[in-house]
A protein has these predicted regions:
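N-terminal export/targeting leaders of redox proteins
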Residues: 1-36, 149
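Electrostatic cytochrome c docking/interface patches
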Residues: 24-57
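Short, well-structured alpha-helical segments
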Residues: 63, 112, 135-142, 146
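Protein kinase-like catalytic domain
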Residues: 66-69, 145-149
Length: 149
């Protein structure tokens, strides 16, 4: 039954399975003044979905490095900035660039590029040419981060 569900989810396209955006099309974006000012999707991001993605240990995995405000999960990370007040510290444009490719902001960042498929290192064959999150998932997480005031 579980395999049937996974097959159905994959056939829908753009569904995240084990943290990978299966069948996610890449969209062009432009970096301007340290951010990506234009959303990756026409549909606005949904903050509730964004929080679900960020706190899911099989999808966003943000809590591996960050502490998430309001989360009761044990073993949240402390090697990256606490996400409280993210919407006050950064604009949606800046947050979008950090999600898409954090190394464009800080070349030494260990944060994965969630919406990048080229110039990556040590990517398993089954995960090549696929972003970690699809464009809508990135926009959802950005909407959630912006809401953290």
């Amino acid at each position: 039954m579980r395999l049937l569900f996974m097959a159905l989810a994959i056939s829908v396209g753009g569904i995240s399975v084990a943290g990978q955006a299966i069948g996610a099309p890449m969209v062009a974006y432009r970096v301007v003044d340290g951010g990506i000012p234009i959303a990756l999707t026409e549909q606005p991001g949904d903050a509730t979905r964004g929080r679900d993605i960020a706190t899911n240990r099989q999808v966003g995995l943000c809590q591996l490095c960050h502490q998430v405000p309001g989360s009761t999960d044990r073993f949240q990370g402390d090697i990256a900035t606490h996400l409280s007040g993210a919407g006050t510290r950064w604009t949606a444009s800046q947050l979008r660039l950090r999600m898409v490719d954090s190394r464009r902001v800080n070349a030494d960042s260990v944060m994965p590029a969630y919406f990048k498929i080229d110039a990556l290192h040590r990517v398993g064959a089954s995960w090549r040419d696929q972003p970690i999150l699809n464009a809508q998932q990135v926009e959802d997480v950005v909407a959630w981060l912006v809401s953290l005031k």
